[in-house]
A protein has these predicted regions:
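HIT superfamily nucleotide-processing domains
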Residues: 1-114
Length: 114
């Protein structure tokens, strides 16, 4: 999708600080980090929200989870811990409508959701 910023990052039209990449997923540093480590993990194909993952797309979800594990190792947060977040739709806080996971860590994270 030409109007999707994450699709444009996948295609190379917009630069990113790539952390991890496979044929199915791309992980890159968030440009507005909310923690010392804040990485965005996306499927390379455009899937708008978590609710748009049908049975035929479960392999993308599997690839995203593996990517989160690899990102945690690359960023050296796998031992102390980290948080993963998926925002879904407007009321869930989703701003960019291309499925993505946030990987946050590098410090003790607060427990509030604000």
């Amino acid at each position: 999708m030409d109007d999707c910023i994450f699709c444009r990052i996948v295609s190379g039209q917009i630069p990113s600080s790539r952390v991890y990449e496979t044929d199915q997923v791309l992980a890159f540093d968030d440009i507005h980090p909310m923690a010392p480590v804040h990485v965005i993990v996306i499927p390379k194909i455009h899937i708008p929200t978590l609710m748009d993952l049908g049975d035929e797309r479960m392999k993308e979800l599997d690839a995203l989870i593996v990517a989160v594990q690899e990102v945690a190792k690359v960023k050296k947060i796998d031992q102390k811990g980290f948080r993963t977040v998926i925002n879904c739709k407007e009321e869930g806080g989703q701003v960019i409508f291309h499925l993505h996971l946030h990987v946050l860590g590098g410090e003790k994270l607060r427990d509030d959701l604000n």
